[in-house]
């Protein structure tokens, strides 16, 4: 008699930082029957492969104070917990994995109320409030950065790194980079993660003319909410909302200018791409600054607060690095040194150990 496959529910929603690691994990568990838990009209409706049935619940974060809106949100939360509990029970699921965010609460509470194991993956150097609160409830918290351990004293935690998309696991082939860039010029890649970064985009457009004069090409991934798209025209300037083959692009890049979300940083390390980091100043608890600090201490990046950064300063810093190939190479080596390219395998092994024991 053939054993039925293990059923696993993955709760991941909202941004690429939550979704890409979860998708990478799912790809490493081909023998599992996996379903997805998300939120309607969020990025998961586009990114999650169709092979994983998508279940949705209505959930959002609490605002400051206890007004009518908070009571409405509380009502939605209770309803979501009951819906997830029913899904887990009727579907005979044997475990839950979550990558955090608002959706983690209902998933963790529902699973633990049924006695199911929960694996929580936290990508950031400073674990979020949801992770810190629910971490002790979980079977184990898998960490992207070892430094995060100190913020979770009551949780069982292990550092596995942050899984990257499968395209980053087959490096060494740049033939898929279908952009009109000569092979012998420096390339600067600018990106703000899955949500873009309008303030960074503005600084880059002001600073870029001097980089063009230095012979550099700029590949600028603006996101889809930039009001100034098409405001800069130059033969060495390639502007796109997104680019599918980030692995090939980051491998080709001499330098990246980026926010410091955990997912983006993980991709930089796997590709060995040196970076100038500009943490998103409105991130919850300024957690992107904690991520950037890990890279700065490792010598893999330069970090600037958005409030301190002018177009002139950014222009100068980039030119200095382009004129110092030895320093850029060292930064790239330092980035590689903190990479965990087999993170998805490590997390999959951990999931198997917890769910199958």
UniProtKB/Swiss-Prot annotation:
Instruction: Give the Pfam families listed for this entry.
Output: Glyco_tran_28_C, Glyco_transf_28
Q: Cellular component GO terms, alphabetically? A: plasma membrane
Q: E.C. number, please?
A: 2.4.1.227
Keyword terms of this UniProt record: Cell cycle, Cell division, Cell inner membrane, Cell membrane, Cell shape, Cell wall biogenesis/degradation, Glycosyltransferase, Membrane, Peptidoglycan synthesis, Transferase
What membrane topology does the UniProt entry give? Peripheral membrane protein
- Residues reported in the UniProt entry to bind UDP-N-acetyl-alpha-D-glucosamine: 15-17, 124, 165, 194, 288
- Reaction catalysis annotation: di-trans,octa-cis-undecaprenyl diphospho-N-acetyl-alpha-D-muramoyl-L-alanyl-D-glutamyl-meso-2,6-diaminopimeloyl-D-alanyl-D-alanine + UDP-N-acetyl-alpha-D-glucosamine = di-trans,octa-cis-undecaprenyl diphospho-[N-acetyl-alpha-D-glucosaminyl-(1->4)]-N-acetyl-alpha-D-muramoyl-L-alanyl-D-glutamyl-meso-2,6-diaminopimeloyl-D-alanyl-D-alanine + UDP + H(+)
Give the pathway annotation: Cell wall biogenesis; peptidoglycan biosynthesis
Q: What class of enzyme is it?
A: transferase
Q: Which PANTHER family match?
A: GLYCOSYLTRANSFERASE, UDP-N-ACETYLGLUCOSAMINE--N-ACETYLMURAMYL-(PENTAPEPTIDE) PYROPHOSPHORYL-UNDECAPRENOL N-ACETYLGLUCOSAMINE TRANSFERASE 1
Q: Which purpose does this protein serve, as stated in its record? A: Cell wall formation. Catalyzes the transfer of a GlcNAc subunit on undecaprenyl-pyrophosphoryl-MurNAc-pentapeptide (lipid intermediate I) to form undecaprenyl-pyrophosphoryl-MurNAc-(pentapeptide)GlcNAc (lipid intermediate II).
Can you tell me which family this protein belongs to? Belongs to the glycosyltransferase 28 family. MurG subfamily.
Q: What is this protein called?
A: UDP-N-acetylglucosamine--N-acetylmuramyl-(pentapeptide) pyrophosphoryl-undecaprenol N-acetylglucosamine transferase
Coding gene? Answer: murG
């Amino acid at each position: 008699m053939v054993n039925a496959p293990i059923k696993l529910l993955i709760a991941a929603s909202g941004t690429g930082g939550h979704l890409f690691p979860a998708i990478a994990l799912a790809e490493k568990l081909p023998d599992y029957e996996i379903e997805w838990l998300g939120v309607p009209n969020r990025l998961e409706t586009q990114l999650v492969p169709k092979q994983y049935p998508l279940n949705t619940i209505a959930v959002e974060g609490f605002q400051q104070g206890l007004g009518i809106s908070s009571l409405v949100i509380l009502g939605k939360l209770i309803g979501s917990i009951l819906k997830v509990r029913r899904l887990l029970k009727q579907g005979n699921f044997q475990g839950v994995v979550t990558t955090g965010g608002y959706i983690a609460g209902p998933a963790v509470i529902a699973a633990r109320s049924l006695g199911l194991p929960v694996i929580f993956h936290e990508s950031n150097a400073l674990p979020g409030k949801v992770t810190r609160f629910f971490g002790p409830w979980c079977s184990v918290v898998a960490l992207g950065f070892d430094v995060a351990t100190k913020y979770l004293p009551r949780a069982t935690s292990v550092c596995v790194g942050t899984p990257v998309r499968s395209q980053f696991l087959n490096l060494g082939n740049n033939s898929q980079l279908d952009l009109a860039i000569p092979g012998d010029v420096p390339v600067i890649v600018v990106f703000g993660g899955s949500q873009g970064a309008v303030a960074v985009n503005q600084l880059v457009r002001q600073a870029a003319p001097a980089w063009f004069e230095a012979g550099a090409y700029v590949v600028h991934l603006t996101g889809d909410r930039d009001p100034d798209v098409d405001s800069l025209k130059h033969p060495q300037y390639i502007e796109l909302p997104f680019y599918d083959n980030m692995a090939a692009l980051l491998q080709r890049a001499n330098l990246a200018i980026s926010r410091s979300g955990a997912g983006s940083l993980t991709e930089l390390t796997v590709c060995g791409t040196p970076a100038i980091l500009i943490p998103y100043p409105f991130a919850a608890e300024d957690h992107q600054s904690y991520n950037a600090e890990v890279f700065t201490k490792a010598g893999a990046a330069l970090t600037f607060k958005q409030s301190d950064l002018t177009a002139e300063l950014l222009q100068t810093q980039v030119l200095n690095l382009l004129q110092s190939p030895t320093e850029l190479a060292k930064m790239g080596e330092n980035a590689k040194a903190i990479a965990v390219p087999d993170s998805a395998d490590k997390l999959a092994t951990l999931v198997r150990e917890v769910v199958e024991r």
